[in-house]
């Protein structure tokens, strides 16, 4: 009897040892795979497929959407105790406001159908009770906005929105597209969720413009508005300095290069051109980045061809571009951040355009801040223009929205606050009319 017990114990010990050895071998193999330069592996190689199965097929980011927003709202508003309150053009205020209303928008942005709506319908809904507004600059896919807020909007990759308004009184969602068109859908949020958002929301008193001015009815007019912003001046960037940000290593990595990639210098070493068998990365010390590759062999992919489609494919491409931008901004030690502004989709190609933001305010230049072109999920080109700004002691009060609305003429339009270059290298804040192209 005792001999049988000893035999069972010995067998259990042997099995445990075998399992431990197998686990150790697996961990060693996984660690070896992690250490490989997967970016340089052919996509159809056995090692690349093994790495992709264990750690995901994308280089530097996950295939599944991260849920991190690629676009930043510029205005948020919510009715609290019968009074509309809003926040605008401030990163700190905007982050707190988004946290307060996220659950509300998660419920509102769950649907699949939109129908054309009239300005009169929107104006009536704005007067019918509590409302919430979420506004971006540019064209943001409705499905992406829904995902960032925790909702799901079916086929939302096909409509690009600028402003979203939830009218609780009429239980409708209104969306304003980037070209000024207006759509609506039935929407409803739980009373408890709305009340929770109202308790957490903080902002300044404001109201909707309604039908009083030649601007969109949902335009926010703040009471006694004094939006004071500093003048900005360009500061020099040197990406090749040993003291510059995270250095070039991370920047090279997100573009699929190693720290030891071959390069040649131009313009007295003010430009370095990194090359491998399939792609080229041109880096200027002053902050201009230009990447080019062939779709068939690129090492930077948002997803493998045929893996995903629709909103999931768009989400993956936005994540890929956003993470590259994050690495570039760190390398340049800039004090700006990026926000998705426009999307172009044609056949198998997707183009993403990003705004540069300073403290939550867009900075507009002669050229786009960042542009990414994908083909079937493969990054084929990218251009990024890094800048660093110094806030001057002098500030300027931006023209209040109420005065700008009073001066609007013609067809209804939107309003935008942004920095524009003026007088050499100085950037001055101002409020602009957003007219739709005929």
Regions found by a protein language model. Give the residues of each.
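Transition segments tied to proteolytic processing and entry into folded domains
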Residues: 364-386
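Short small/polar-residue motifs
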Residues: 160, 255-264, 275-280, 332-341, ...
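N-terminal membrane topogenic signal
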Residues: 10-15
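Preferential activation on post-signal-peptide N-terminal prodomains/segments
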Residues: 2-5, 16, 20-22, 26-314, ...
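Beta-strand-connecting loop/turn residues
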Residues: 269, 286-287, 348, 376-378
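Short low-polarity hydrophobic stretches
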Residues: 24-29, 320-321, 370-372
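Segments that shape or occlude catalytic/ligand-binding pockets
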Residues: 300-308, 312-364, 383-438
